């Protein structure tokens, strides 16, 4: 037994829209069935398919008495089962927008008399028919042929009803059992297997009640022993929906009375209702079967989703069952009144949704657009029925008389609920008298039942109230019912007296019945079981009188929320989501907030999980973080990752929760599961910050995240050797990526090992060597050594030994002192370092790896010296110009050589400057001393001559020692410079590519290598560059000469005259050489680079070279004087050099001005003549000789119009034009041609295309010029 909650979710709807729908449906006669957004109306042999949106009606005349039908929306096929004589016929129609086609008509059964019910599968693949003990399956093939199979029951009981549920499950209902079969369709044949069965017997009910009694006693014993627990149960939250405090059973005595009352209730009902049929209905939305057994007054609920079976005890008899959406609709009859109850019975959800008092029973319920249309039975007062325009009743009679028996027509008028025949008005009076008599008896019984109900449920309800004992709802009965029952109670005695009279009158009426009526009564039971279960036999107009409408979804949510039925609200929303737009996530959020306030954090987090795609994650995270509920927060964050609704912050937060809970294993398992989803780089950073280095190492190595593995080895553990070995086991891409990231560190700590491994990779994978050049940018010496190992052809041990022996012999003969020995040891160290490199090189060439794993810092320093010696000591022969990246390799090699060359030149200049300063200081000191001695001690000159000589000898010795050191250093630097220049020149000369020439020019200009610049610029025919650098080179040479002259300024005054003469000679030679260079360049390059020449000639002191150059250019280039003035202005030169030219130019200008004045006077005279002609045109008359119109070519007649352009027109020819038409059209043509010409001139490509394609190009250009257009 269940306790039902009352939530009124329905209201009567009387709006205009619903009235329009009701009038539209009532205008068609027949039975109405809603299929999605369409109505199907059946009337005998006709089917009307009505589309309310477009008001399209398709009428199908089946020529059969329609028994059953089904419309499939996917293939748009309609299967109709109909009766023709004694056979069952299936016809298949294809429905389109406004037409239909009959695909096939098939005969299923020849004997139709015993068939109770037919079922059509929604997939339109098979049909099921029910006889008394036999179920027949008809499988429809694609060609609409039939394969037949049967299910025969051997028991004594007849089959009451059958239903076809989801997943091809067949439900067979008998009087005492319900059987569930699984249908299997294989090879166009239907087989079945029994899944389960449920007992509907009275003994089974009693056993279940006794079990409940024991369970209730145990609960009461526990509650009596533990009063605290009882109090706690009363104070529990209202989310436990299945138990309601106001209906709980309180005492053991009351429980015993309840169970005894139920037994008596069942015994009394079985005596009264032995012959009552079983009512049943199947709800497709819930996949639930409802069975009402009026013999026991029990409603069985079979949930086919989980095969759960439960029952509900009823108080009153159920007349009929209906199901729409997920609602169960029960129709009851009490005291001549009909009560309609709408329930939701699904799992633990037990709701009474609406109660309604009716004066007439309901034949069907239609659901459309969230409206429940109640079809109310009305007895036909007149035998004639008005038929709509789609159907002609008289023609139907003729067809049915030929096909059906006379008794079959009576079946059409039979009521499918009460099975009473409405024949005439006299029968109505007779049955009314009988019903009134029965009502009195029923009322008395109801009073006794009410008293028993009061004892069972301890409800303090008045004797005059109607008690719905079956569902324990006293509040749901309308006031109309109460009034009716109250009036019946007061008129009880009057009814008892009237019943006796009515009984006597009834006997008289029955005697006066005619023989024809008796014959009709005997024929009433002919074929009464045929198709009774299909409920398909009512044909009346204007049946829909009441329309119920569900309340607004917001109101429904508030109702559930007030009563705190959140779980039922969620179930209701899930059931109703296919019919209405409901925000289920919002409902879960409300329920979760409620649970969170009740401190039920675990249940709340599971409800918040349901709102993942709706609710912001920050809302939930903030709530749980404030209370430090990391355990529940981890559940929510894990679900975010399951539903793919997360970001990097969520993963970091989840990992931090694992860390705070010390769940290291769970953290590792989470990373392993979600490795493809999460950002591993950020997770590794988090783990590294947390100190889990070993975890990151293991994970990165396992999942082949090479970058993180190597980065940890290098940055945290500084294990370069292990990381190098790991890197060179990888593929080429990963090797390159990791070397570009950490290569500079490997070269710093393990240079020889890295170079060796790089060589192996380059040979193995055929990689170009230039890819790895960026690794050596911090150490140029090792870069050069790396390149030489691959490209130098001239590395030979014999040559190197020969060079070493020469150097040793040279230095041993030269030096004998200690200083000399120190320098020799330095050179020996350099030679030994060079030997180390060559040994390594020879070992690599022979295939023997060098043992470079245990090298120290000293060896690294030796390696660097070997690289330096390689640059300065060997004449290279490099194969640079063969690969794809030749430009890069050339740039690197030549840049290294040029850097070394620049450093050596800077060092040489510094040494020269220092030596010059020292010599100057010494000589000045000595001269000063000698002058002082000469002035003071002239008499002692002879005595001190010897001392002076000795001092001179000492100074000469010192000079000799210093000069020897200088000579040694100069020899070394000169050798180095010669080798470097040799290698640079060789690279430049071997070059034959223009692009490399351009790169070499840039590099040579950066490092001021003028010799190479002049060579490359002449090869490239870039004479401007050769001019600039040749002059620059000559200037540097002259500067060196001037410095030498300045060195001799400290000498006595006798030599100053010679120094001044040398300055003058240098100046003259300098000016002549620069002028000659400029003239030669002008001959080679022409007059394009005269700006450079002007610049250099303006720097000279003598202007005669500039005047010569200007005269030459003026002859060759025809430069104007204004251009010459601007050029001289740039370089701040005076105009005296072009004075004669300016005077000649001014004289020419005066002559031209005089000529122009004469031309101006002539033009003025011509203008005066033109003005006189215009005045004559204004004031003088014109002779018009035109006799014909210029348009129509007819003789002119008044009115006529003449123009000065000598065109004449009729006034009607011109109409409203005030302009000469012929001239105006010509002007238009000219304007269009000008516009085209402008457009074509703006499009230079088109202009030149037409110009090239034209035969006479001069005429083409002259046409454009004739339009008065010139390109801007």
UniProtKB/Swiss-Prot annotation:
GO terms for molecular function: protein-macromolecule adaptor activity; zinc ion binding. It is a single-pass membrane protein. One of its GO terms (cellular component) is endosome. It comes from the Eukaryota. Residues 957-967 have a biased composition (Polar residues). Residues 216-260, 842-862, 908-970 are annotated as: Disordered. Residues 234-260, 850-861, 909-956 have a biased composition (Low complexity). It is found in: Membrane. The chain crosses the membrane at residues 771-791. It holds the Pfam family VPS11_C. PANTHER family: VACUOLAR PROTEIN SORTING-ASSOCIATED PROTEIN (PTHR23323), VACUOLAR PROTEIN SORTING-ASSOCIATED PROTEIN 11 HOMOLOG (PTHR23323:SF24). This is RING finger protein PFE0100w. The lineage of its organism: Eukaryota, Sar, Alveolata, Apicomplexa, Aconoidasida.
């Amino acid at each position: 037994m269940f306790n039902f909650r009352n939530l009124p979710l329905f209201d009567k709807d009387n709006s205009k829209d619903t009235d329009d729908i009701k009038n539209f449906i009532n205008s068609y006669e027949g039975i109405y069935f809603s299929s999605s957004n369409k109505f199907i109306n059946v009337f005998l042999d006709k089917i009307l398919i009505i589309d309310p949106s477009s008001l399209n009606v398709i009428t199908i005349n089946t020529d059969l008495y329609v028994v059953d039908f089904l419309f499939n929306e996917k293939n748009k096929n309609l299967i109709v089962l109909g009766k023709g004589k004694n056979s069952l016929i299936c016809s298949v129609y294809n429905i389109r927008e406004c037409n239909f086609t009959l695909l096939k008509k098939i005969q299923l059964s020849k004997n139709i008399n015993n068939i109770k019910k037919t079922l059509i599968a929604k997939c339109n693949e098979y049909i099921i028919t029910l006889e008394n003990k036999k179920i027949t399956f008809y499988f429809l093939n694609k060609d609409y042929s039939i394969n037949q199979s049967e299910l025969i029951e051997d028991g004594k009981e007849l089959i009451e009803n059958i239903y076809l549920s989801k997943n091809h499950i067949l439900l067979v209902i008998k009087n005492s059992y319900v059987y569930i079969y699984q249908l299997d369709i294989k090879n166009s044949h239907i087989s079945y297997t029994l899944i389960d069965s449920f007992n509907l017997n009275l003994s089974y009910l009693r056993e279940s009640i006794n079990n409940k009694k024991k369970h209730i006693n145990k609960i009461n014993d526990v509650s009596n022993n533990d009063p605290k627990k009882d109090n706690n149960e009363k104070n529990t939250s209202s989310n436990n929906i299945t138990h309601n405090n106001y209906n709980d059973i309180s005492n053991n005595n009351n429980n015993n009375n309840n169970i005894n009352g139920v037994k008596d209730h069942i015994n009394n009902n079985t005596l009264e209702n032995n012959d009552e049929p079983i009512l049943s209905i199947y709800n497709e939305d819930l996949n639930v079967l409802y069975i009402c057994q009026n013999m026991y007054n029990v409603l069985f609920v079979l949930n086919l989703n989980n095969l759960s079976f439960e029952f509900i005890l009823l108080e009153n008899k159920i007349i009929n069952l209906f199901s729409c959406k997920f609602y169960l609709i029960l129709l009851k009859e009490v005291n001549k009144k009909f009560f309609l109850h709408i329930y939701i019975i699904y799992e633990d959800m037990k709701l009474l949704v609406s109660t309604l008092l009716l004066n007439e029973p309901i034949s069907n319920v239609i659901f459309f657009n969230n409206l429940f249309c109640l079809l109310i039975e009305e007895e036909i007062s007149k035998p004639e029925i008005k038929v709509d325009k789609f159907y002609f009743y008289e023609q139907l009679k003729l067809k049915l008389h030929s096909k059906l028996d006379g008794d079959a027509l009576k079946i059409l008028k039979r009521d499918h609920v009460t099975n009473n025949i409405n024949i005439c008005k006299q029968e109505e009076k007779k049955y009314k008298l009988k019903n009134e008599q029965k009502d009195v008896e029923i009322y008395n019984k109801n009073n006794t039942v009410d008293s028993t109900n009061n004892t069972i449920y301890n409800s303090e309800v008045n004797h005059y109230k109607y008690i719905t004992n079956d569902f324990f709802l006293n509040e749901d009965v309308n006031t109309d019912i109460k009034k009716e029952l109250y009036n019946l109670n007061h008129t009880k005695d009057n009814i008892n007296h009237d019943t006796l009279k009515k009984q006597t009158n009834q006997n008289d009426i029955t005697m006066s019945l005619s023989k024809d009526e008796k014959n009709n009564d005997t024929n009433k039971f002919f074929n009464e079981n045929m198709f009774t279960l299909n409920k398909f036999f009512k044909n009346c107009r204007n049946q829909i009188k009441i329309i119920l409408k569900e309340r607004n979804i917001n109101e429904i949510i508030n109702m559930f929320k007030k009563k705190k039925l959140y779980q039922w609200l969620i179930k209701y929303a899930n059931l109703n989501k296919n019919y209405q737009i409901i925000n289920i996530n919002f409902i879960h959020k409300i329920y979760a907030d409620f649970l969170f306030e009740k401190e039920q954090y675990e249940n709340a987090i599971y409800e918040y999980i349901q709102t993942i795609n709706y609710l912001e994650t920050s809302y939930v995270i903030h709530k749980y973080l404030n209370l430090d509920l990391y355990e529940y927060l981890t559940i929510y964050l894990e679900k975010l990752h399951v539903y793919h609704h997360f970001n990097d912050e969520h993963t970091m937060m989840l990992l931090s929760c694992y860390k705070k809970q010390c769940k290291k294993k769970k953290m590792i398992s989470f990373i392993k599961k979600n490795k493809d989803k999460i950002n591993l780089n950020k997770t590794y950073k988090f783990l590294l910050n947390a100190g889990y280095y070993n975890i990151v190492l293991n994970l990165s190595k396992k999942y082949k995240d090479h970058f993180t593995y190597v980065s940890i080895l290098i940055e945290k553990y500084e294990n370069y050797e292990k990381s190098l070995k790991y890197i060179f086991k990888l593929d080429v891409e990963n090797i390159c990526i990791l070397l570009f990231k950490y290569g500079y560190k490997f070269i710093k700590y393990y240079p020889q090992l890295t170079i060796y491994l790089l060589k192996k990779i380059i040979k193995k994978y055929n990689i170009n060597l230039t890819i790895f050049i960026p690794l050596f940018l911090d150490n140029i010496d090792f870069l050069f050594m790396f390149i030489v190992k691959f490209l130098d052809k001239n590395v030979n041990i014999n040559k190197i030994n020969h060079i070493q022996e020469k150097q040793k012999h040279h230095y041993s003969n030269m030096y004998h002192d200690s200083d000399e020995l120190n320098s020799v040891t330095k050179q020996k160290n350099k030679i030994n370092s060079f030997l180390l490199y060559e040994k390594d090189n020879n070992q690599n060439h022979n295939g023997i790896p060098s043992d470079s794993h245990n090298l120290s810092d000293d060896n690294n320093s030796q390696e660097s010296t070997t690289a330096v010696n390689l640059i300065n000591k060997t004449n290279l022969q490099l194969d640079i110009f063969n690969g794809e990246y030749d430009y890069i390799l050339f740039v690197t090699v030549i840049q290294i050589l040029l850097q070394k060359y620049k450093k050596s030149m800077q060092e040489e200049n510094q040494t020269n400057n220092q030596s010059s300063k020292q010599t100057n200081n010494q000589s000045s000191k000595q001269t000063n001393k000698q002058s002082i001695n000469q002035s003071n001690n002239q008499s002692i000159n002879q005595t001190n001559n010897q001392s002076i000589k000795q001092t001179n000898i000492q100074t000469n010795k010192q000079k000799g020692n210093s000069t020897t050191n200088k000579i040694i250093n100069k020899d070394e630097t000169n050798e180095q410079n010669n080798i470097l220049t040799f290698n640079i020149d060789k690279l430049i000369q071997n070059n034959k590519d223009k692009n490399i020439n351009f790169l070499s020019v840039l590099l040579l200009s950066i490092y001021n290598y003028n010799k190479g610049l002049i060579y490359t610029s002449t090869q490239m025919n870039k004479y401007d560059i050769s001019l600039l650098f040749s002059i620059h080179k000559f200037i540097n040479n002259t500067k060196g000469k001037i410095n030498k002259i300045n060195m001799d300024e400290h000498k006595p005054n006798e030599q100053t005259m010679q120094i001044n003469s040398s300055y003058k000679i240098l100046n003259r030679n300098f000016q002549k050489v620069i002028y000659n260079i400029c003239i030669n360049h002008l001959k080679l390059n022409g007059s394009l680079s005269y700006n450079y020449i002007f610049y250099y000639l303006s720097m000279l002191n003598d202007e005669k070279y500039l005047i010569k150059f200007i005269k030459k250019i003026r002859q060759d280039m025809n430069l104007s004087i204004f251009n010459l003035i601007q050029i001289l202005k740039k370089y701040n030169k005076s105009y005296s050099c072009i004075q004669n030219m300016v005077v000649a130019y001014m004289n020419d200008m005066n002559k031209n001005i005089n000529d122009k004045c004469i031309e101006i006077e002539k033009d003025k005279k011509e203008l005066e003549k033109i003005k006189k002609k215009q005045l004559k045109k204004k004031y003088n008359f014109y002779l018009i000789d035109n006799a014909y119109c210029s348009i129509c070519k007819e003789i002119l007649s008044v009115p006529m119009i003449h123009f000065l352009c000598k065109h004449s027109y009729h006034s009607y020819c011109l109409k409203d034009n005030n302009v000469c038409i012929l001239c105006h059209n010509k002007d238009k043509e000219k304007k269009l041609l000008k516009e085209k010409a402008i457009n074509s001139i703006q499009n230079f490509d088109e202009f030149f295309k037409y110009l090239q394609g034209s035969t006479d190009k001069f005429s083409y250009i002259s046409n454009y010029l004739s339009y008065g257009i010139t390109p801007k």
